[in-house]
Amino acid sequence: MDSEVQRDGRILDLIDDAWREDKLPYEDVAIPLNELPDPEQDNGGTTESVKEQEMKWTDLALQYLHENVPPIGN
């Protein structure tokens, strides 16, 4: 039947109790500061990292607006 789960026996050979219980120590995980969410979320509770927030501006290319302004007058 389609509604029954078909288990793949090949994966069972790769996973044992020692592998399942193995944990990565917390102090070995190094996350760059720009990848972490803003710790002071006063304006709404966004979970975006600083890098993701900065990329919003580059997605729209707004940082180049001031460079492409035509001269006034003449």
From Swiss-Prot:
Segments crossing the lipid bilayer: none
Chloroplast recorded as keyword: no
Involved pathway(s): Protein modification; protein ubiquitination
One of the GO BP terms on file: anaphase-promoting complex-dependent catabolic process
Pfam family, one: Apc13p
Region (Disordered): 33-53
Subcellular location: Nucleus
Principal localisation: nucleus
Keyword tags: Cell cycle, Cell division, Mitosis, Nucleus, Ubl conjugation pathway
Domain of life (superkingdom): Eukaryota
InterPro entries the UniProt entry points to: Apc13
A cellular component term, taken from the record's GO annotations: anaphase-promoting complex
Record bears the keyword Cell cycle: yes
Similarity comment text for this entry: Belongs to the APC13 family.
Quaternary structure, from the entry: The mammalian APC/C is composed at least of 14 distinct subunits ANAPC1, ANAPC2, CDC27/APC3, ANAPC4, ANAPC5, CDC16/APC6, ANAPC7, CDC23/APC8, ANAPC10, ANAPC11, CDC26/APC12, ANAPC13, ANAPC15 and ANAPC16 that assemble into a complex of at least 19 chains with a combined molecular mass of around 1.2 MDa; APC/C interacts with FZR1 and FBXO5.
Matching PANTHER family: ANAPHASE-PROMOTING COMPLEX SUBUNIT 13
Functional summary from the UniProt entry: Component of the anaphase promoting complex/cyclosome (APC/C), a cell cycle-regulated E3 ubiquitin ligase that controls progression through mitosis and the G1 phase of the cell cycle. The APC/C complex acts by mediating ubiquitination and subsequent degradation of target proteins: it mainly mediates the formation of 'Lys-11'-linked polyubiquitin chains and, to a lower extent, the formation of 'Lys-48'- and 'Lys-63'-linked polyubiquitin chains. The APC/C complex catalyzes assembly of branched 'Lys-11'-/'Lys-48'-linked branched ubiquitin chains on target proteins.
Official protein name in the record: Anaphase-promoting complex subunit 13
Organism name: Pongo abelii
